Structures are given as structure tokens and as C-alpha cells.
């Protein structure tokens, strides 16, 4: 079985939950065309929504850069720093849980960033939707796009790296 763990911010843990539902055989997702790739082959070790710097640092034993923006209790970075933070968090998650696939997401001002780390490769990408956490612009559209793009990337990884069909 392939182990997956997520530490998510702007995707609110929904990447991990979607994978978990398929892995566990929830009826509501049986008709998804990728159901058979995940069900019986993958399990989710952890799916975490971690919006705060302190939460990430405490749970994953990692130091993050100071946020670029002040936003309530959440961290908010520039696009450039979102990419850096997503990589840091995915690496810390993989090291902490020793999972096969670690997924991390973060977004402040910009398109956000997602890092998927496997034993073979690091995949870094953004959503296709610009959003601004501080102003509350396009947050849900960016989230939905990020979840879908990350899930599609996980499916491609399972096919290419693990030979699942």
C-alpha cells in the first residue's frame, strides 16, 4: 500500500480527504474515474489543515520563514515564498511520517503553491487562479483549482511512479 500524508493550508485538508474517501471506498466517490487507482492501493496516514505557522512548526518540527503579511492568525506569504514554504513543509512531513507521498499547500497573495514529494521526485506547481488572502479575493476559486490540480497530479504520479492503472 502506498502511504500519503498531507499538510494543507489553502486547500483546507481537502486533498487528503478526497484521497481518503476513495481509499476507504466511500459510496459517494465510487463513480469517480480514478477511484480504482486509489481504492485498494493507497491509504492516508494524515490529512491536516494547518493554516498557522506555529501549528506547522510544532507538529512537523520545522522552522518556517516569517510571514510576509499579517493576517489574523494565519501565515500569508508572497507567491515566491509560498513556493519555498510548500517545499519546506512537504519535506518536513515526509521526514516526520516517512510516507511514500507527502503533499503540502500554502497560499497568501498569488496563485498559491503545492508541493508533492515522492521517493523519486519533487513536484512543484501553483493553482491557475490568482487570489489574495488579505483582501479575500478569489479564495474559494483558487482553493477548488488547487485541490483539483493536486488530485490530478497525484493520479499521474500513481500511474507513472507506481504503475497503477
Curated annotation (Swiss-Prot):
InterPro entries: HcgF
Domain of life according to the entry: Archaea
Segments forming a coiled coil: none
Any single Pfam family the record assigns to this protein: HcgF
Family of this protein: Belongs to the UPF0254 family.
HAMAP family reported in the protein's UniProt record: UPF0254 (MF_00673)
Protein name: UPF0254 protein MmarC7_0182
Amino acid at each position: 500500500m502506498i502511504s500519503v500524508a498531507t499538510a494543507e493550508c489553502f486547500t483546507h485538508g481537502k486533498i487528503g480527504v478526497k484521497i481518503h474517501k476513495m481509499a476507504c471506498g466511500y459510496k459517494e466517490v465510487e463513480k469517480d474515474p480514478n477511484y480504482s487507482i486509489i481504492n485498494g492501493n493507497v491509504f492516508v496516514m494524515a490529512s491536516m489543515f494547518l493554516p498557522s505557522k506555529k501549528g506547522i512548526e510544532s507538529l512537523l518540527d520545522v522552522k518556517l520563514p516569517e510571514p510576509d503579511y499579517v493576517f489574523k492568525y494565519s501565515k500569508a506569504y508572497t507567491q515566491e515564498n509560498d513556493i519555498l514554504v510548500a517545499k519546506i513543509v512537504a519535506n518536513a512531513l515526509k521526514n516526520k511520517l516517512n510516507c511514500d507521498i507527502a503533499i503540502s499547500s500554502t497560499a497568501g497573495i498569488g496563485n498559491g503553491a503545492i508541493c508533492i514529494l515522492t521517493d523519486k521526485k519533487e513536484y512543484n506547481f501553483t493553482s491557475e487562479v490568482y487570489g489574495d488572502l488579505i483582501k479575500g479575493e478569489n479564495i474559494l476559486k483558487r482553493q477548488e483549482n488547487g485541490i483539483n490540480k493536486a488530485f490530478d497530479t497525484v493520479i499521474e504520479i500513481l500511474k507513472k511512479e507506481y504503475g497503477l492503472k
